[in-house]
Amino acid sequence: MTKRRNLFMVGSSFTIDHLPPEIWLCISKLVGTSDLHNLCLINRRLYLTITSDEIWKRRCYDRWINRESLDILTGNDYDSIPVSQWYSYYLRRAKWENKIFCLLWGLTEETNPQHFREKYLHILQFRHYKLATFLHRIIKQGYIPDKRPLDLITYANYLLKNVRHKYVFPLFYPTNAAELKNLNNMASRDAEMIYLRLSAIDTSFDDLLDAREFILNGICSDLLQKYKKIEEFLKLRPVTRVSKLISISTDYLDCFTQPHDSVGQTNDRATGRELHREDFMLLRVYSREGRGYKTIILAIIQAITKRYNVDSYLARDHLVVSEPDFPDGRAFVTVNEDFQPYIFDKEDLLSVWSNNFHNAENFESTVLPALLEPISIQHLLTEFFRELLRCKPRPFEGYPNRAHGLRDMFPYGKVEVPRDVTMYFAFIYDLFDGMFESGMTSLRGQMLRDLLNYVNANNFGDLNIIIGQNALKEPNDCWSNKRDYVLLDDNNKIGYFYTDIETEDTLCALNQYEVDGKVFITTIDILGDIRVRLAEGLTPFQGDNDKLWESFSSVVPRTDWGLFFKGYDKERRRMQLNPYIEEKLSNLANDEQPLHNL
């Protein structure tokens, strides 16, 4: 007993006061708010040690940096804050985050359409990097009864779309020649960022960032098992690094497997930690095909090798790697018909391509430079639209009940790409197709106006971000008006669950009315699709409503359910109407006017 007490005597070399700050920092990361409260009551000296400025400031700094790294779009918007200044910045940031949240909460209580629009645009006036990370976190937390209602998450989702349009539009509408040149350079040097920015239009891609980081960390762990230090691996010549990284990546990515390997793939594998081609590039559902595309696979290889100091650029069909030991100082990576990447030198490249040309010398002087020219932003975008948008999103035939098939359909994401997002990309593809056919070098004139008008119809507020105030007249047909287009009649008919007799889909009623002796029910499914259906094709849900809600409560906040509902009422076993819809029904009841004229 005496020896044990002596170990912790003040002044002893073993006292806890002499533990290095790194140890206290690790301890503080494991301590939650309730733990700190209990610790304050039990051992105030230990509590003061953990919460001291020296430890707590560094903990705040580390936590914030980790949170920032989750959002790939915020990295270049402000300089990193020195540790010495971080604590005060952390406190300031918490203040304006609370302000944003108050404004967002006020948005859920607004019942006047014009005032709603004004408040929505007011939130967009915050700097985009402030909004992006905060909204990202709100959406990721999901629906929390009484704290994070459905309508709040839905509005946050639309706001985040608005913010991220700022990153998408410069890809299509560069303001000057210098900016266009920089974009082209970025396209060849870092094709991954192009795909990430394109995918930023779909906010559900946030769920894939953790899985993507898991893959990159797994590759690093495998390297550390083979090499004691990463520095040993970095000493290898670039082409060797590329080869070994491709080999290791095969264990994590499905884009390098042989075609017969994907046949008979089970759901168990689909829900594992393997990351699919579209998942890695955060474009998982724009194509339903099981094989990879050359440009995307090469961009994946480029993204992985870039982390290990491999200098490369992306050409049309090749990834060109700087390799001093090879002739001409370059090595070439391409993908064969079986989507297997392989590496070769210039001599092999000439022997393969020159067989198709009678004059080998003419090929090397004229054709080869064109083949190895860095890919331009226009060609990269065209490749993306041509390959990934020719297919519709994955069909639902194999999943009769969407509520129980979401994990099989989208093992990493939580929701299908919305129809308006698919239309957005398809619309831009048509513009690019017409642009190249007409020989135009940039989007101009009516095509640009059509594009901006289309996007603005689905996401009002974008025009102010992109090209300034009052550049185009905002149309009345925007996403917020969906709640006004749905015919509402009786509160007692809204919010109950139904099952489609034919497809077994789970639906929620938005209205019910009778026309010419037939009863119609306006429904919304768990993906936010609103349709009018015959009542004879539906049946009231017979199962456990509470379990049903739990099965898709993580999905619907990212859809348009929040335009009508704020949560689930367990006592009444139905959805709760949000303030906007309640106000609308109240006004209609007071006016006693017909709600539809069919």
UniProtKB/Swiss-Prot annotation:
Substrate recognition component of a SCF (SKP1-CUL1-F-box protein) E3 ubiquitin-protein ligase complex which mediates the ubiquitination and subsequent proteasomal degradation of target proteins. Probably recognizes and binds to phosphorylated target proteins. Recognizes FZO1 and regulates the amount of FZO1. Regulatory factor for the mitochondrial fusion machinery. Required for mitochondrial DNA maintenance. It is found in: Cytoplasm; Mitochondrion. SUPFAM superfamilies: F-box domain. Pathway: Protein modification; protein ubiquitination. GO terms for cellular component: mitochondrion; nucleus; SCF ubiquitin ligase complex. Disulfide bonds: none annotated. This is Mitochondrial distribution and morphology protein 30. InterPro entries: F-box-like_dom_sf, F-box_dom. PROSITE patterns: FBOX (PS50181). It comes from the Eukaryota. Interacts with SKP1. Component of the probable SCF(MDM30) complex containing CDC53, SKP1, RBX1 and MDM30. Interacts with SKP1 and FZO1. Keywords: Cytoplasm, Mitochondrion, Ubl conjugation pathway. Pfam families: F-box-like. Residues 13-59 form the F-box domain. The keyword Cytoplasm applies. GO terms for biological process: mitochondrial fusion; mitochondrion organization; protein ubiquitination; proteolysis involved in protein catabolic process; regulation of mRNA export from nucleus; SCF-dependent proteasomal ubiquitin-dependent protein catabolic process; ubiquitin-dependent protein catabolic process.
